A protein has these predicted regions:
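A charge-rich, low-complexity, intrinsically flexible signal that marks solvent-exposed coils, linkers
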Residues: 1-84
């Protein structure tokens, strides 16, 4: 199975986990997904009034320079760990 196929499967699997991950893990999943699918963060950082959007953007921005393939593999590995 190609990395892209594994990434797509992990996306589906992440929606069917037996329990919801904690907020920090959810941010990591979000950031890895965005980096794997879109590359480095772009656009403006959300303002102080959008704390959730700001946290999500910051988590994604911390992965700047990580290749999309590496981010996809990390995402797949994290979802696999959460499935256990």
């Amino acid at each position: 199975m190609s990395l892209q196929d594994q990434f797509t499967q992990a996306q589906a699997d992440s929606k069917n986990l037996s329990e919801r991950p904690d907020n920090m893990t959810m941010l990591k999943l979000y950031a890895l997904f965005k980096q794997g699918s879109k590359g480095d963060a772009s656009g403006e950082r959300p303002g102080f009034t959008d704390m959730i959007g700001r946290a999500k953007f910051d988590a994604w921005d911390q992965l700047k320079g990580t290749s999309q393939d590496d981010a996809m593999q990390q995402y797949v590995d994290l979802v696999d760990d959460l499935k256990d």
